[in-house]
């Protein structure tokens, strides 16, 4: 198998994966099942128990966020309810502990924000689900016109898909957003930071950025995004 060398070297007592056997995880979990090593999956996303719940390997245990997710696993994918444990959302513990939070002045300085203006943040979603640009442009015009009850500014967080050059709609909208930043005052874009290699740019793992944006925004606007759950 693909992971024979690792199993031979470490001889694990248990194998835990963040999916029930998608992509490369399926080979890891299949190898553990073949060797008779106990295994389990940890549900990490709000929609994983409903949209991606079919196992790609023989998985013994699952831990999920809530009673609703457990119901989705049991009724939607025939999991044995005795093998599904409700364990909360460990990946969000850092939000409650505030371990990722930057100081406000440091965050505002990072994005050239005005500390005296209210902050409206827009978290983009998949372009092919709903174009972001019409919403962003409307907000950009609004904060730049000073027609709101209080002086405000707009911070735009692009979606990881914006950094793909194919299909072209991703790159086109990315270009539109950066042009908008040049055109209007009080409009700022979270600058993309390369994650290294083929990993692309900021996505789900830039916790300092995400948690600070949500903590210091007066309003967060998004359409069909996991950011709704995190907010």
Q: Model-found features: residue ranges?
A:
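Donor nucleotide-activated moiety binding/catalytic core segment of transferases
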Residues: 7-8, 168-229
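Catalytic cores of nucleotide-enabled group-transfer and carboxylate-activating enzymes in metabolic
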Residues: 70, 104-105, 221
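Active-site and donor-binding regions of nucleotide-sugar-utilizing enzymes
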Residues: 1-99, 199, 209-212, 227-228
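Glycine-rich phosphate-binding loop signature in dinucleotide/nucleotide-binding domains
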Residues: 8-12, 113-115, 216
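Redox-cofactor binding/interface segments in oxidoreductases and associated redox assembly factors
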Residues: 17, 64, 122, 156, ...
């Amino acid at each position: 198998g693909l992971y024979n060398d690792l199993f031979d070297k470490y001889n694990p007592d248990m194998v835990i994966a963040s999916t029930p056997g998608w992509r490369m995880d399926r080979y890891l979990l299949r190898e553990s099942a073949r060797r008779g090593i106990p295994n389990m999956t940890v549900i990490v996303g709000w929609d994983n128990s409903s949209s991606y719940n079919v196992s790609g390997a023989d998985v013994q245990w699952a831990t999920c966020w809530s009673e609703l997710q457990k119901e989705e696993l049991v009724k939607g994918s025939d999991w044995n309810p005795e093998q599904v444990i409700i364990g909360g959302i460990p990946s969000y513990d850092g939000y409650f502990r505030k371990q990722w939070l930057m100081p406000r002045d440091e965050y505002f300085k990072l994005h050239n924000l005005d500390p005296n203006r209210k902050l409206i943040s827009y978290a983009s979603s998949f372009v092919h689900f709903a174009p972001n640009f019409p919403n962003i442009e409307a907000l950009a015009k609004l904060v730049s016109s000073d027609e709101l009850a209080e002086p405000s500014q707009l911070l735009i967080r692009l979606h990881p898909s914006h950094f793909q050059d194919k299909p072209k709609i991703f790159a086109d909208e990315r270009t539109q957003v950066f042009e908008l930043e040049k055109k209007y005052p009080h409009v700022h874009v979270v600058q993309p930071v390369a994650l290294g290699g083929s990993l692309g740019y900021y996505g789900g793992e830039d916790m300092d950025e995400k948690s600070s944006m949500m903590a210091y925004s007066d309003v967060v606007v998004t359409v069909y995004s996991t950011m709704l759950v995190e907010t």
